[in-house]
């Protein structure tokens, strides 16, 4: 899953700051950028399904992430948008959000995940143990994802498999992994980049949607 790939990236980038914005028809900050990787992974893995409505508001999700990165003094800041849906909700156009990111020197990487079409899927709510079944519908707009990535000086990746996704995230973290070290006579302080993941994985069925 996307969570497994992100787990690996976080666990192997000690000292970097990571955050997560969840997105559907609305968006919400699950974890603001933090160097506390234990807290980050716990909150990311506990993201509930279906709490943010039906749809994919890419522009709104990006704007939420930008708001939390803009004031940072980190030397490099980036957003990784992971989505299997096209923009179909929200009042902010994705291109407008991408232009805002570029104006704040925030790099945007976009990942279109899955192969287009539908596939059966089952989900067990960890809180209630209730089992849901439905279809995972992938309909990402690669043209738009390429465009907004280019506007914000980033890159688009298409990830049809978990391996593709993992490799894309490795490339991104390698590109963004510069570390600046400042020295004084008695201390050495390492200042790392900040990165926010936006999760916009959309599951649709007659029972629930995200």
Tell what function each PLM region has.
Residues 53-56, 78, 85-151:
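VWA/integrin I-like adhesion module and closely mimicked acidic/polar interface patches used
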Residues 178-210:
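C-terminal signal-anchor/stop-transfer transmembrane helix together with its immediate cytosolic
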Residues 1-77, 91-92:
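Membrane-embedded segments
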Residues 27-29, 88, 117-118, 156:
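Short beta-strands and strand-coil junctions in structured, solvent-facing domains, enriched
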Residues 35, 57, 140, 160-164:
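Short beta->alpha linker loops
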Residues 21-24, 82-85, 111-114, 159-160:
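Active-site-proximal beta-strand/loop segments in catalytic clefts of secreted hydrolases
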């Amino acid at each position: 899953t996307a969570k497994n790939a992100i787990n690996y990236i976080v666990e192997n980038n000690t000292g970097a700051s990571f955050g997560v914005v969840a997105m559907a028809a609305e968006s919400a900050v699950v974890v603001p950028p933090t160097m506390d990787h234990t807290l980050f992974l716990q909150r990311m893995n506990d993201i509930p399904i279906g709490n943010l409505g039906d749809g994919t508001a890419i522009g709104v999700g990006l704007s939420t992430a930008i708001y939390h990165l803009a004031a940072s003094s980190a030397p490099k800041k980036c957003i990784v948008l992971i989505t299997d849906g096209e923009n179909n909700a929200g009042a902010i156009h994705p291109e407008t959000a991408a232009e805002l990111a570029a104006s704040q020197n925030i790099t945007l990487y976009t990942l279109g995940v899955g192969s287009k079409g539908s596939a059966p899927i089952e989900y067990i709510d960890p809180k209630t143990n209730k089992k849901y079944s439905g279809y995972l519908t992938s309909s990402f707009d690669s043209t738009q994802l390429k465009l907004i990535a280019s506007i914000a000086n980033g890159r688009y990746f298409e990830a049809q498999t978990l391996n593709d996704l993992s490799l894309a995230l490795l490339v991104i973290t390698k590109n963004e992994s510069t570390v600046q070290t400042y020295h004084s006579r008695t201390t050495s302080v390492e200042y790392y980049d900040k990165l926010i993941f936006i999760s916009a994985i959309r599951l649709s069925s007659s029972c629930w949607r995200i």
